[in-house]
Amino acid sequence: MKLFGTDGVRGKAGEFLDSFLAMRLAMAAGIYFKDKSITNNILVGKDTRRSGYMIENAIVSGLTSIGYNVIQIGPMPTPAIAFLTEDMRCDAGIMISASHNPYYDNGIKFFDAHGNKLSEDIEKKIEEIYFDDKLIQASKVDMEKIGQAKRIDDVIGRYIVSIKNSFPKDLTLKSLRVVLDVAHGAAYKVAPTVFKELGAEVIVMSDKPNGLNINENCGALHPANLAAEVKRLRADVGFAFDGDADRLVVVDEKGEVANGDSLLGVLALYLKEQGKLQSSVVATIMSNGALKEFLNKHGIELDTCNVGDKYVLEKLKANGGNFGGEQSGHIIFSDYAKTGDGLIAALQFSALMLSKKKSASSILGQVKPYPQLLTNLKIAEKKDLDKIKGLKELKKDLENKNINTLFRYSGTENLIRLLLEAKDIKLLEKEMKNVVEFFKKALNG
């Protein structure tokens, strides 16, 4: 049984991800980190899902039972956990979140002492420990050595300072009217505070979490309400975050939702113009062909990697780069953060608008993405794609029609993601129907 997916362990809370799994997984991770322990402290944060309380208590039980002390900081963005784990000199950090998923899902992500997401090799080692009954039992400590847990509520200030430090000192947001959609999620306190302290006129949406409304018709996956509000209020820009605030969607002053690759492109060029861009930009295999064209036109190389912001960061480290991201809105400025950070990306785009004295639409309009169609198809089983009869011929046929393809399984759900890209949208719509029918037969019998 495989526990880890694309971004940690994720599933339906109380079913796959129940208190037993959370406790045992925490013990397994704790056993792994014990060998490298310096402070014997592990940081635990969460988003605003109701199930977070259950999972947090289970994690604390697991860690303290093997002698670890736990620092609980409550609802905070995922990138805050990455930052605070290193800043507070903890052996590891744990974030309880299912990111953009509905409230009934939850997940567990791990960070090492430096705030980095774990490699697949380390995740595999933790999985092996998880299934080793003898090792789990042997790791339990005597009563006198059981760890302690304490809750700290004021660490939000540390993260706010670090975020504000990413914004140019010679600029102010005083001239900007900004609408923020915080998705009833982990950024509901942090995001408005940062923008207000930097001087912006701030209108906040979806900032009343009740444990069951995270990402519900709001945030990065549902930006329509934000778009309407930006237009109605004649705001300069709108920023939508997802439940754990590691991704960003931008809405321009006309109420148009920006393509994630357009955002990547203009931010990369902004870094280059400041002399801050190191090496090539990294995007994933799902990036739009227009992004590469735009970057190459401006003398910037583009490298690609697998889907997932941790793979973007790994590639950046290998290349000596400092900027990359995903079309979905995970954007990494590695000079400031170890993971995708929606707040940092929002501030950098604001700085770009202010320094250029241009509107959001005129800046984002520099990159004109090719039409793409993405279908998430629910499937019964995940067969090896290389062994599906007729798939090779299907891809060749699409290639002959100048259609780029990407077919990949979700790392966290029983889905296959079907992506087609071409200059002709009508052709895409026609061919997508054929592709969906092909995979329905191949994977659903």
Curated annotation (Swiss-Prot):
InterPro entries: A-D-PHexomutase_a/b/a-I (IPR005844), A-D-PHexomutase_a/b/a-I/II/III (IPR016055), A-D-PHexomutase_a/b/a-II (IPR005845), A-D-PHexomutase_a/b/a-III (IPR005846), A-D-PHexomutase_C (IPR005843), A-D-PHexomutase_C_sf (IPR036900), A-D-PHexomutase_CS (IPR016066), Alpha-D-phosphohexomutase_SF (IPR005841). Keywords: Isomerase, Magnesium, Metal-binding, Phosphoprotein. Its EC number is 5.4.2.10. The modification Phosphoserine is found at residue 99. One of its GO terms (biological process) is carbohydrate metabolic process. Its cofactor is Mg(2+). It catalyses: alpha-D-glucosamine 1-phosphate = D-glucosamine 6-phosphate. GO terms for molecular function: magnesium ion binding; phosphoglucosamine mutase activity; phosphomannomutase activity. GO terms for cellular component: cytosol. The active site is at 99 (phosphoserine intermediate). Mg(2+) binds at residues 99, 242, 244, 246. Binds 1 Mg(2+) ion per subunit. Activated by phosphorylation. Signal peptide: none annotated. Belongs to the phosphohexose mutase family. Catalyzes the conversion of glucosamine-6-phosphate to glucosamine-1-phosphate. This is Phosphoglucosamine mutase.
